[in-house]
Amino acid sequence: PVFFYKTGKIRHTRSPISRNFSYLCSVVAFIPTIMMYMEEVKRIPYGVSNFVDVIEQNQYYVDKTMYLPLLEDQPSNLFLIRPPRFGKSIFLSMMSAYYDIARKDDFERLFGNLWIGSHPTRLQGTFQIMSFDFSRVGGSREQLEVNFQIYCTGELNIFMNKYHDFYSDHIRAQFEAAPTFEAKLQVILGEAHLRNYPLYLIVDEYDNFTNVVLNEHGENVYHTLTHADGFYRNAFKKFKGTFDRILMMGVSPITLDDLTSGFNIGWNISTKQQFNTMLGFSETDVRQMFQYYKDCEQLKGDIDEMITEIKPWYDNYCFSEESLNRDPKMFNCDMVLYYLRQKIDLGYSPKQMIDPNTRTDYSKMKRLLNLDHLDGDRKGVIRRIAEEGQIVADLALSFPAKDLVNPELFTSLLFYYGMLTIIGTRGDRLILGIPNNNVRKQYYDYMLEQYQNKERISLNDLKNLYDNMAFDGDWRPAMEKIAYDYKENSSVRSLIEGE
């Protein structure tokens, strides 16, 4: 028996060649819809950073594989800096799966439906991949080096188990006997060089460990790790000249600058136009994703209205001056997925448009801003940005931690953390602006905290007054409160001068 779809009904026929030939023609237009219903709807990959899991567990993936050939055309050792929650980890995970010689035969299964599946490069499946995620390292001041050794040694053990067949019993015995991470690494590097094994080093959150140290333990401890014979600096010196290709990603340029004298072969592509849209979602990406879930009858509502709703909150990131008039602005990945998940699960937009999980990112940034306490100049920078929404500045590609207190570099730090983005030019300088409401609220919250530290104000009482004015028309108490506070905090001269 054959079943044909027509006008929402299923029709049964024993002879599709005779009476139902016309249905055979009409059904062709419905094949994509039928196939979509036959397949399991893809899950939303919120918070998932493992590319193989996304593919194998039937989760939605926004294809970024077209950037792999562009990266291959760059120098062999690269750095890229992007704000938190912009898809760095899953991109690096995708790269690992693509170049891993241990997954060479998985290419069609993992990448067959992606852009690179039809455009494979000669480097696909040719590397042994060594990966580190330094966000997993932390601890007390006394335990930092020990924890670093434990984590890195564990990753090397995973590497040796994965590529077991490439190394002889003798080499594996040497590896096991090596007492430290550096010694184990040297065993691998020596044998790989001797045997001409191509090695690819991929480091996620290369700056996270040191940023945490800077925040929690201060500049002196940070300086000890990243200068002279500091163990973190020494690790990067081991990487120098020993890997065929290297890609490192992070959220700030601070560690990059402090380590470059020991690791001076990295090429910073953070502001290169070719990679402006490599991380994050374009509006086209978002529309295609929303359309997919609408076609699956998971997402209700008008897509244009949804885009209009989320753009002021999650969009408008630009990381390259050359991209201003040629590339689309970029959405924050996790924010879009947060909205989509809420919209599908609840049937309406989230009451709070800001993902609560981003509060941890804000807390990290706030601690970094408060190093040595904000001086007057830097407070003025934040106040000006909060009030005017933009500032004209030169963008520094990197700078050492000791220069964090320099107000001229402060705007660059805000840019790399995603608190400012490129919105225009003025002469040879950039106009950096607040990208969206999500970030704008973080500025206001920060300013409010600073004011609260000076004089505590009951915000709940203020909210009650404004709510009574807005919802009940009871405006007198709110106006009296404003007039009283103005009188208490203003001088006669302020009135004379018109302030």
Task: Give the predicted meaning of each segment.
Residues 266, 329-499:
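Extended alpha-helical interface modules used as scaffolds for assembling large macromolecular complexes
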Residues 188-192, 222-244:
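Substrate-engagement module of ASCE P-loop NTPases
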Residues 74-78:
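Pre-Walker A (Motif I) flank of P-loop NTPase domains
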